[in-house]
Curated annotation (Swiss-Prot):
Organism: Chlamydia abortus (strain DSM 27085 / S26/3) (Chlamydophila abortus)
Gene Ontology MF terms: structural constituent of ribosome
Chain intervals for the UniProt region annotation (Disordered): 1-20
Protein name: Large ribosomal subunit protein bL36
Keywords from the UniProt entry: Ribonucleoprotein, Ribosomal protein
Length: 45
């Protein structure tokens, strides 16, 4: 999974933007290598 401060999703390639636990993810069931997560502050325990 790639982690970057700014992520972009391309719906024509099957990308979907999802917010989970306060973080932004790009998921792709067609091409799982396109997974991304937006970097942010460290999670609290």
């Amino acid at each position: 999974m790639k982690v970057s401060s700014s992520i972009k999703a391309d719906p024509s390639k099957g990308d979907k933007l999802v917010r989970r636990k306060g973080r932004l993810y790009v998921i792709n069931k067609i091409d799982p290598n396109r997974k991304q997560r937006q970097a942010g502050p460290a999670r609290k325990k």
